């Protein structure tokens, strides 16, 4: 059974209103109230059942670099209000900054954005597309699952934003090669779980970073993994385990795996239960 949306049919005007409200939202509670009806509307438009009664997740794809989650699992990620809020706000600011830079350049051109791992909704980007003209923004959409790309094509046409799309590609983002002259101002990918386990975020960025323009940015700009010890009422930060950024992605692509290693000196602490805490911090943009 498809979830019920308050919209008879979700149209571009509602999508724009949602995007503008999400850009103003300052907490996850507000974002949750905003996104639920829109997400349900997208499910209805694409005939995707977000929470089927029996779900075996058989459409996930195991790659050499991690698990590419199924279209349904990718769609379920949109239910996370804080993820949606901060990514949309950070991505909007990144696009706006690049548009402003291009407008002041001698040879103005659209911002070129690559979205790797779109899922069936292109959720982090789709609501923002009507806010930019085709002359300001052109996107390349990349996903490993043809079912996802088919549904996303339906949405692009329904919301009349297909003219913002330069190319749609069904391919493994860790192997895909763009046209020789293609370079991107922004490369967006959110293909990760906590501690960057299982999913191919690291492999995707280490491969795709070579296709950034000289002043281009990865979105998110940084993903920082750190470790800490917790006991009684004490919290002792051990330090940084790994930082995924444009710089480190380029080092990994060059075969430098030393940055994947870390050593810490343990502090003195009283005998008793001690927890090792592993934290993931994500910097979307600036």
Q: What is the role of each PLM region?
A:
Residues 47-50:
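Short helix/strand-capping turn motifs
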Residues 106-121:
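Conserved class I S-adenosyl-L-methionine
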Residues 60-100:
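Class I SAM-dependent methyltransferase Rossmann-like catalytic core
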Residues 2-14, 19, 26-44, 54-64, ...:
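Class I SAM-binding transferase module
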Residues 119-135:
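Conserved SAM-binding loop of SAM-dependent methyltransferases across substrates and taxa
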Residues 156:
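Conserved hydrophobic residues forming the short capping helix/wall of the S-adenosyl-L-methionine
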Residues 76-88, 117-124, 144-148, 197:
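Phosphate/oxyanion-binding active-site loops and adjacent basic polyanion-contact surfaces
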């Amino acid at each position: 059974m498809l979830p019920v949306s308050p919209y008879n049919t979700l149209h571009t005007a509602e999508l724009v209103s949602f995007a503008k409200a999400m850009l103003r939202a300052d907490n996850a509670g507000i974002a949750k109230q905003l996104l639920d009806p829109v997400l349900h509307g997208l499910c209805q438009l694409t005939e995707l059942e977000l929470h089927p009664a029996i779900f075996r997740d058989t459409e996930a794809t195991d790659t050499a670099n991690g698990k590419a989650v199924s279209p349904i699992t990718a769609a379920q990620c949109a239910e996370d209000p804080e993820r949606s809020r901060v990514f949309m706000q950070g991505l909007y600011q990144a696009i706006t900054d690049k548009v402003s830079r291009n407008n002041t350049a001698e040879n103005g051109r659209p911002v070129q954005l690559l979205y790797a791992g779109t899922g069936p909704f292109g959720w982090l980007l789709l609501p923002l597309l009507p806010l930019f003209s085709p002359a300001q923004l052109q996107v390349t959409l990349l996903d490993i699952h043809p079912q996802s790309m088919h549904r996303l094509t339906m949405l692009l046409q329904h919301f009349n934003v297909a003219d913002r799309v330069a190319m749609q590609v069904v391919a493994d983002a860790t192997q895909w090669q763009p046209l020789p002259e293609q370079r991107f101002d922004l490369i967006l990918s959110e293909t990760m779980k906590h501690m960057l386990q299982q999913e191919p975020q690291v492999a995707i960025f280490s491969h795709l970073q070579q296709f950034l323009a000289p002043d281009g940015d990865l979105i998110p700009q940084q993903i920082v993994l750190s470790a800490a010890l917790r006991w009684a009422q004490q919290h002792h930060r051990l330090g940084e385990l790994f930082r995924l950024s444009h710089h480190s992605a380029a080092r990994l692509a060059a075969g430098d795996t030393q940055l994947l290693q870390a050593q810490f000196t343990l502090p003195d602490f009283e005998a008793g239960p001690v927890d090792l805490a592993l934290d993931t911090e994500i910097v979307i943009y600036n």
